[in-house]
């Protein structure tokens, strides 16, 4: 993976153009931007190929029933775009690609003169298989809990089994981060997450095991972006609550380890660019052709409940249903993530 960094400001129209030279043997591009200015938000306006053709613009994906990427939505002080997402979005032709980042205020009005830092990463095409490197951290003193560590180790095997048919394997290395067991809100992000991500290699996805997330026992896990960034940023991580996955007694049994493994794969899938095949409004779907566009809860649970990216686990008082399936189009999105190499 080749990493390049810039700093700059948005122009009078609220845009900052990032030009990335893609080599002939490279097939994926990840651009992430962030700003430290208060009341400023980042999103991707558009991406253009070396001939100047618009490959994607936000207007085509903002107010439609399908979701391609979270990059176009101004939801925080950082944003990331991985390109291409689908087969029809590619290939990534060699030459200079231009990604236009937009800076806006909390009224969604463009702002000029906003300072931002940008990282662009490209990868050499790995073929039909690849590896996602994971920097795994335990918050607080959780690494000293042997039963928890053993449960996480088993859950990682479940995650690996879910991803194995996609051709993507995972390589896990344990790292240390300075975060308390109650993890900060990852959707809001912040300096604590930036500092944590700075402890990892620029090619690794940071995954942090905490007890709770922002005080909640109802959140199984969160991804800081769809997709997320590999370099340090205010949301460049995946957060996992072991307590939410372990159930009321806080002790992992076999079914709860399965749930934890499904959660790890689900949130890492978001980080690599996968969206839910259907949102729980039953009125919005992913942009992939081989997932059902069901329109009612009962139909969606029949069609998609075993899918790893279904928006929620299906549980009764004794156990949760396995959610380990991924379609070929979903698998291809994983393989196109720049962090898979």
Each PLM stretch: what is its role?
Residues 139, 144-173:
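A short alpha-helix/helix-coil micro-patch that ends at or immediately precedes a cysteine
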Residues 167-255:
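Active-site-proximal segments of metallohydrolase catalytic domains
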Residues 148-155, 189, 260-264, 330-333:
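Stable alpha-helical elements in mature extracytoplasmic
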Residues 26-29, 84-108:
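Noncatalytic modules at the cell exterior or secretory-pathway interfaces
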Residues 5-63:
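Acidic, Ser/Thr/Pro-rich low-complexity intrinsically disordered segments
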Residues 105-142:
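Exposed low-complexity, polar/acidic, P/S/T/G-rich flexible segments that act as propeptides
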Residues 250-332:
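The catalytic-center signature of Zn2+-dependent metalloproteases
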Residues 20, 65-93:
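Beta-sandwich interaction modules
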